[in-house]
Each structure stands twice: as structure tokens, then as C-alpha cells.
Amino acid sequence: MIFKSQDAQKIIKHSVNMSIYNTKEQCINAAVVYQETEIGHSEEFYHEKSAFIYYIIEGEGKWIIEDVEYDVEAKDVVIVPPRKKFYFKGNLKQVCVTAPAWDEQYEKHVQFIDLD
């Protein structure tokens, strides 16, 4: 399967600009999203089914996973297993892969985050 950048769905979600390359209907095993943010993701959440795997392309920031803070920078990989709450802060460009593919019904809100 090939998914082209120009065909990606563009959205803004919780302060993050996202290009969604594919949906679960196109590939149930994984979904790929390119993300850019200047401040981070302003919602703490978890997903009941999918692991979230992030490759940091550019920038630096902080990831908060299960209330533990981790520093990240370009070329780092972050893996968040299913059912682990998380959010992130910082000026970042990154690729997120969810496996299995992200499904909205399994994403659960924990709290909104003030990133100021």
C-alpha cells in the first residue's frame, strides 16, 4: 500500500496539526499520522486497543506517560502501550504510528492540559 502526502486528511486536534495518511478501513493493522506542534498536545488521554509509536523528526519536548515525565529530542522513539495515559509538550515534528489502526471509539479522555 502507498499513501501519498497530498491525499492525507489535514486536521488540527488539541494544538497539533495532523496529516492522517490512512484510516482503519484502509489498513486495520496500522495507521500513520504526521504531526507538527509548537506547544504540544493539550489533552491527556489513553487508547484501549492501540499502541502509539512516535518517531521524533525535529525539535524537543517532554512526554508525560502515566504521570512520569521524559525528555525527548530529534531521532528519539516514544512507545505508549494501550491503556497508558499520556500527553506531550514542546515544539515537535513527529510521525505517529498506531497499531492496530486508531479507532475513535477506543480513545478515552482523561483531562485537558494547560500548555502555557
Where are the regions a protein language model picked out?
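Forkhead-associated
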Residues: 37-39
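A short beta-strand-loop-beta hairpin characteristic of the jelly-roll/cupin
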Residues: 47-74, 110
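Histidine-centered divalent metal-coordination motifs
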Residues: 45-48, 86
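Short strand-coil-strand connectors
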Residues: 24, 64-68, 91
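Compact, glycine-rich, soluble single-domain proteins
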Residues: 33-35
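A short, N-terminal "cap"/entry segment at the start of jelly-roll beta-barrel domains
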Residues: 1-31, 41-44, 109-116
